[in-house]
Amino acid sequence: MSNRVIIFDTTLRDGEQALAASLTVKEKLQIALALERLGVDVMEVGFPVSSPGDFKSVQTIAKTIKNSRVCALSRALEKDIDAAAQALSVADQFRIHTFISTSTIHVESKLKRSFDDVLEMAVNAVKYARRFTDDVEFSCEDAGRTPIDNLCRMVEEAIKAGARTINIPDTVGYTVPSEFGGIIQTLFNRVPNIDQAVISVHCHDDLGLSVANSIAAVEMGARQVECTINGIGERAGNCSLEEIAMILATRKGLLDLDCGINAKEIHRTSSLVSQLCNMPIQANKAIVGTNAFSHSSGIHQDGMLKAKNTYEIMTPESIGLNRNNLNMTSRSGRHVIKHRMEEMGYKPTDYDMDSLYEQFLTLADKKGQVFDYDLEALVFMESQAQDDDKYQLQHMMVHSDSTEGVATATVRIAVDGKDITEAATGNGPVDAAYNAIARATDRKINITNYKLSAKGEGQNALGQVDITAKYNEQMFHGVGLATDVVEASAQALVHVMNLVYRADKVADFKQQIHKERELGGV
């Protein structure tokens, strides 16, 4: 049996289902490119039949990614498989992942069919998907609660039908490691054609056991683990990719298994997903939490000074978290910035040097010292800008009356290149700025969530503002970054306004198509 574990990332499919606001196509592509750099073998990037937006994002990613296999999800229905195949057809290499429920409660209560009917649907779906590709994965949804005889039968028939990967999900995070490992062991003992497929696992974290269950399965012969960055996903989340990768690396002597993950990209990828998805990483999160390499106990600190491996089983550098605290000032030249970006793993094509250096100088004049995390924050914000932004914040001035609690804000916004200046009052400077921006853009949206976080350390740290806004029953996520909280808040709102504008244009386009079809049918 191979000692290579295939890493199947589903951040952009299962992970995205946990978000309050959907990612844009551009944001999904950013994450896909980061996953490719990370070295994932397979990335599941969407459910094409679910919406035109998901179809487009799958197609865009499939067209761009070259070094990882792109996968799309489909139910055991021909229309789903058709949509997946069509969206993936532009890829160099792709996988169709089809699934159906197999547990008694799902078969009887959700599908309202007999197990034999479900078995037939599964076989037909796999055979149909094989018309488009040899790489077909089949999942037994809720396998963790499926009677073992039925599960063995389903796996055997799916392999006979042509599935080359069989996924065994613990869909509701119900099993414990000994139990889940036992399921995998039983499949290897009882399914006669098990050697013709890779056995995969997809574990959820409802009881906090997703990683432990996945490792138990791997020890019993599973050779694909489905996971997400930072463990994001439905309900309590999914198996965490970074934890699986570092378990395999750190305990190689015990497990004797490898995966193709470039561990030095873990920190960077984790931060990107956290920012784009507006999902903070808890401080004590294994591998990527801010406390993961912190030592506060005096005994621990003393041990660390004598020998780092007394209390560290891996190094921050091993996941790409550089301890180099070299600071840069406005006197630092372009070559210094370029060197620091290279040290952090960025290629020249990942950012615009002219734009980055200009922003760096502006920030250095404000802060005095600029650190690595500042540069990464600037690159992230630059990546959020769109060439076709309708609204651009040019200038803002705020006056606050501390005695009355009333603030006045004046903003100048370029709308399609034409400057518009508006002023408004509000209950505090942020509220005033938001009211002024609403006037300038002639749009009123409902802010449902506002979050402020520091990007960096000390009193001069950059402030990142994330907002979730509701407009026409759709949710949008905006982000802003500045040394001033009010400015960062204004940037976040303008970001949302541009997303809303593009959503309106798409809606108008769809409506026009609908009208043309109606006229054509008359």
Swiss-Prot record:
Protein name: 2-isopropylmalate synthase
Location of the Pyruvate carboxyltransferase domain: 5-267
UniProt keyword list: Amino-acid biosynthesis, Branched-chain amino acid biosynthesis, Cytoplasm, Leucine biosynthesis, Manganese, Metal-binding, Transferase
A cellular-component GO term for this protein: cytosol
Residues annotated to bind Mn(2+): 14, 202, 204, 238
Region (Regulatory domain): 392-522
InterPro entries named among the record's database cross-references: 2-IPM_HCS-like (IPR050073), 2-isopropylmalate_synth_dimer (IPR013709), AIPM/Hcit_synth_CS (IPR002034), Aldolase_TIM (IPR013785), LeuA/HCS_post-cat (IPR054691), LeuA_allosteric_dom_sf (IPR036230), LeuA_bact_synth (IPR005671), PYR_CT (IPR000891)
Subcellular location: Cytoplasm
Pathway annotation from the record: Amino-acid biosynthesis; L-leucine biosynthesis; L-leucine from 3-methyl-2-oxobutanoate: step 1/4
Top-level lineage group: Bacteria
Gene3D superfamilies found in the cross-reference section: 1.10.238.260, 3.30.160.270, Aldolase class I
Cited function: Catalyzes the condensation of the acetyl group of acetyl-CoA with 3-methyl-2-oxobutanoate (2-ketoisovalerate) to form 3-carboxy-3-hydroxy-4-methylpentanoate (2-isopropylmalate).
EC top class named in words: transferase
Organism: Shewanella frigidimarina (strain NCIMB 400)
GO BP terms in the entry: L-leucine biosynthetic process
Catalytic function, reaction form: 3-methyl-2-oxobutanoate + acetyl-CoA + H2O = (2S)-2-isopropylmalate + CoA + H(+)
Cofactor: Mn(2+)
